[in-house]
Amino acid sequence: MGIVGKAIKWTLNHIPRPLLQKVAGLGVPMLGMLYIGRERKCPICGKRVREFLPYGYGTPRKDALCPRCLALERHRLLWLYIERETDLLKGYPTLLHIAPEVALKRKFEQHYGTQYAEHYITADLESPLAKMHFDIQDIPLDNESVDIVICNHILEHVEDDRKALRELHRILRQGPRRPASPRPGRAPGALPTFTTGSR
């Protein structure tokens, strides 16, 4: 593990998450200037870099974090899925983005703009990046009040995932649904469509 990987690992393990979220948007892109190159292209920010930064709390993963927009592998995969396999970006559905990732949040804010900003809702337990703050197990939104929920890498961290899933089901408008976060290794066409009866 190189010095950058060690520095990132130390930072992740010693700086409180809310503070880290406030400063990472400035610090990492400055570090990214050292990674100017053409070998990698981030599908979220469109920037080319020599390589992605290592990232991880334990053993940092190589080539994980975009030094320009802070997107991780799972964020880039989700964005590609949204762009290529959904019609989310063709309109302005009410979208609840739980624990919004910095890079994805920027893209959605650009898409929704000021005219449709009320249709893009960000929420988190404590992140300063979110508009609303709540526990996903007790969502303070009305029944059937959102069209889409993006909840990436969260359910494995809650006390009662079944309760959280019931809450997500409660706030979603009725109709066909697809998972917002495809599991790596599955072809997009193989993703099942969830209907009211199968939820």
Predicted regions and their residues:
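Histidine- and/or cysteine-centered catalytic micro-motif in compact active-site loops
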Residues: E101, L125-E126, I154, R183-G185
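Local beta-strand N-terminus motif with an aromatic residue
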Residues: Y92, V146-D147
